[in-house]
C-alpha cells in the first residue's frame, strides 16, 4: 500500500516537473520569437531611414548640380568679377609688402641720420667746452661763487653762524639786501654774456 502511494506521488512529481520544463521551453521559444520580430522591426526602420537619407542626399546633389550647371550669364559675370577682385587683392598684398619694405628702409635711414647728427652735436659740444678760453673759465668760476653765495642765502645760520650772532634782526635784513644786490648783478651779467656768446 505504501509502495503504491510512493509510486503515485513520484509519478505526479515527475509529470509536474515535465510540465514545468515544457512551459519553460515554450516561454523561451516565445521570447526568442519576440526578440526576432523586434530585431526585424528595428532593421526595417533603419533601412527606411537610410533609404530616405540616400534619397534626400541624391535630391540635394541633383539640385546643386542643376543650379551650378545652369548658371545664367549674370551669375557667370559675378563669378568673373569675384575672381578679378581676389586677384587684385593679392596684387595689393604684394604692393603693401613692397611699401612696408620701403618705409622700413626710410625709417632706418632717418634713424641713422639722427644718430649721426646727435654724435656730431655731442662732439661739437665736447670740443666747445673742452677748449674754453681763459675768459670763459673765469666766468665759470664767478658763476660757481655766485651759486655758493645763493646757498649761503638759503642757509644763513650754517654759512655765517659766527657773523650773525652779534647782529640784531634789522642788521641781518640789511645784510641780506646787500648780498642780494652783490649776487644779482654778476648773475645778470653772466646771463647776458652767455646769451651774447650763443647768439653771436
Swiss-Prot record:
Record's keyword terms, sorted: Amidation, Amphibian defense peptide, Antibiotic, Antimicrobial, Cleavage on pair of basic residues, Repeat, Secreted, Signal
Any one Pfam family match given in the protein's UniProt record, by short name: Bombinin
Tissue expression: Expressed by the skin glands.
Gene Ontology biological process terms in this record: defense response to bacterium
InterPro entries (UniProt xref): Bombinin (IPR007962)
Modified sites of kind Phenylalanine amide: 68, 129
Compartmental location: Secreted
Signal peptide location: 1-16
GO cellular component labels: extracellular region
Record family assignment: Belongs to the bombinin family.
Physiological role: Has antimicrobial activity, but no hemolytic activity. Preference on killing Gram-negative non-enteric bacteria.
Protein known as: Bombinin-like peptides 3
Organism: Bombina orientalis (Oriental fire-bellied toad)
Amino acid at each position: 500500500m505504501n509502495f503504491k502511494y510512493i509510486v503515485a506521488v513520484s509519478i505526479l512529481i515527475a509529470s509536474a516537473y515535465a510540465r514545468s520544463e515544457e512551459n519553460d521551453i515554450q516561454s523561451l521559444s516565445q521570447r526568442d520569437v519576440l526578440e526576432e520580430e523586434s530585431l526585424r522591426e528595428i532593421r526595417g526602420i533603419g533601412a527606411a531611414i537610410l533609404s530616405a537619407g540616400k534619397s534626400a542626399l541624391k535630391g540635394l546633389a541633383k539640385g546643386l548640380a542643376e543650379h551650378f550647371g545652369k548658371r545664367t550669364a549674370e551669375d557667370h559675370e559675378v563669378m568673373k568679377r569675384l575672381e578679378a577682385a581676389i586677384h587684385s587683392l593679392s596684387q595689393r598684398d604684394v604692393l603693401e609688402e613692397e611699401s612696408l619694405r620701403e618705409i622700413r628702409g626710410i625709417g632706418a635711414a632717418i634713424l641713422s641720420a639722427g644718430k649721426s647728427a646727435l654724435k656730431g652735436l655731442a662732439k661739437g659740444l665736447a670740443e666747445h667746452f673742452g677748449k674754453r678760453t681763459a675768459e670763459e673759465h673765469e666766468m665759470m668760476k664767478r658763476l660757481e661763487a655766485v651759486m655758493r653765495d645763493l646757498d649761503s642765502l638759503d642757509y644763513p645760520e650754517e654759512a655765517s653762524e659766527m657773523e650773525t650772532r652779534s647782529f640784531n634782526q634789522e642788521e641781518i635784513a640789511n645784510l641780506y639786501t646787500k648780498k642780494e644786490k652783490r649776487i644779482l648783478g654778476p648773475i645778470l651779467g653772466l646771463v647776458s654774456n652767455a646769451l651774447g656768446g650763443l647768439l653771436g
